[in-house]
Amino acid sequence: MAVLPLLLCLLPLAPASSPPQPASPSPCPRRCRCQTQSLPLSVLCPGAGLLFVPPSLDRRAAELRLADNFIATVRRRDLANMTGLLHLSLSRNTIRHVAAGAFSDLRALRALHLDGNRLTSLGEGQLRGLVNLRHLILSNNQLAALAAGALDDCAETLEDLDLSYNNLEQLPWEALGRLGNVNTLGLDHNLLASVPAGAFSRLHKLARLDMTSNRLTTIPPDPLFSRLPLLARPRGSPASALVLAFGGNPLHCNCELVWLRRLAREDDLEACASPPALGGRYFWAVGEEEFVCEPPVVTHRSPPLAVPAGRPAALRCRAVGDPEPRVRWVSPQGRLLGNSSRARAFPNGTLELLVTEPGDGGIFTCIAANAAGEATAAVELTVGPPPPPQLANSTSCDPPRDGEPDALTPPSAASASASAKAAEAGPPTDRGVQVTEHGATAALIQWPDQRPIPGIRMYQIQYNSSADDILVYRMIPAESSSFLLTDLASGRTYDLCVLAVYEDSATGLTATRPVGCNRFSTEPALRPCGAPHAPFLGGTMIIALGGVIVASVLVFIFVLLMRYKVHGGQPPGKTKASAPVSSVCSQTNGALGPMPAPPAPEPSAPRAHTVVQLDCEPWGPSHEPMGP
């Protein structure tokens, strides 16, 4: 029991345990300034010449400024674990790529500046994790596409979205319509050509909308515009006012913009680009009575059309008006027609029935409508019984004969079939096409006049030889009834057909009708004994000239050898007697002395040729040397 009081006395003397020390901060990156003495922590690296995000960042930083550098890529690990970051600036770099999930750890981030970079698209995963983002600045990039789900994580918190100065032609308007807390929306200086009606109807807190310098020709009325007053000056606007800017667009001033003209604005410089009567005029100076539209007028429709069952049919309807009318089709049963498995409706007013059935016949109604009214036109379609299997793109009652090419038979199959039938049955029966003259390389083709066929545009001649399956086509004017074929191969058999190309008044389509076919053979080419070809002559001349040169060289060498032998093996002009002669004629001391006798020539064997020996005459007394 005495130990317990002793322990109680020693307990206050025990050293108190020290609290845990905070982790040492990371060193400040080179060329950066770090404010770590007071909260919040900041890392400032503007204009530091950085090529990438510094890896030694303090992960506790609340502000990171990396503007005016040369960063090209934002990687997943660059900003990892920076859960307390509130402000991130990457403005005016060379960023082309942002990795998916690069900002996924920045759940506290409120402002992200990516303006002045080289981004071309923004995908769904690149902004993932920014659940508290309020300011997103993407201006001055090269954005051409914005994914529909790119803003999903920040749709409920985003207050400021700047997409200006990009290359956007389309926007995910439904995704933008979900930004219920956005106050400022910058869409200026893009390539937007249209805005769907009701695109801003759910943006109840929108205070400024900038759509200047786009390609908008009209702005549809929106419930947002009717609820809030429109003022041009943002400074003097009340808190609930909406500032709308749409200058620099090619506005088409018609009745669709009357709602905008009725709003009092004084300091915007919008102008009309069309119609021509109002082009260039100040938008707010044009009276309301001049914003007019023209009702549609149907200018063209298909005539009554008759097609066999199973064939396609095209119904056409053209209309004009201001604004451009929209064309719709109604079936004989009163149903509105659109794109389906059996029909296709085109924006130009054409309705194409891919496969007609007997029940499709009746009166089709074309309806052209715009803001000023609508116009209708009726087009009758008759669907007859299906054609015989042999018919192919022809309204003639005579089916094509076996082996005769038509519009639906491939050329190779047609020629092969024709050749096979010809081998069995001989030449085909003439159907009006005559080959009146033919030689080795040419043939004159004639056919009867086809005036009974209305609307003939031209004739088509197609032929091929027995050694070639490729068809050759010739287009002949409708006024002609003959044609001279040239460049044919000699000694070959040709299959030839003539077709009339005309416009079928019943269908309004271009059709073909066979005029006739024929088979002929070109004459074999003769082999005349003419002059040799130029290449042969050239080779012969070269060989002859070379032979002459070689013979001349041989003769020259032979002459030199003969002269060498004649002079006893010495070059011409240098004989044995030449040495004494030269010594005699030499002058040493200015006086002439007696010349010694020349040495006797050495005996030599007799030669068959003449030997020339030169001797000098003896000097007389008068030639004695002179005294001193």
From Swiss-Prot:
Residues 17-540 are extracellular. SUPFAM superfamilies: Fibronectin type III, Immunoglobulin, L domain-like. PROSITE patterns: FN3, IG_LIKE. It is a single-pass type I membrane protein. CDD domains: FN3. InterPro entries: Cys-rich_flank_reg_C, FN3_dom, FN3_sf, Ig-like_dom, Ig-like_dom_sf, Ig-like_fold, Ig_I-set, Ig_sub. One of its GO terms (cellular component) is presynaptic active zone membrane. Residues 1-16 form the signal peptide. The chain crosses the membrane at residues 541-561. N-glycosylated. LRR repeats lie at residues 60-83, 84-105, 108-129, 132-153, 157-178, 181-202, 205-226. Its main location: membrane. PANTHER family: LEUCINE-RICH REPEAT AND FIBRONECTIN TYPE-III DOMAIN-CONTAINING PROTEIN 3, SYNAPTIC ADHESION-LIKE MOLECULE SALM. Can form heteromeric complexes with LRFN1, LRFN2, LRFN4 and LRFN5. Able to form homomeric complexes across cell junctions, between adjacent cells. Does not interact with DLG4. Cell adhesion molecule that mediates homophilic cell-cell adhesion in a Ca(2+)-independent manner. Promotes neurite outgrowth in hippocampal neurons. Lacks a cytoplasmic PDZ-binding domain, which has been implicated in function of related Lrfn proteins. This is Leucine-rich repeat and fibronectin type-III domain-containing protein 3. It comes from Bos taurus. The gene is LRFN3.
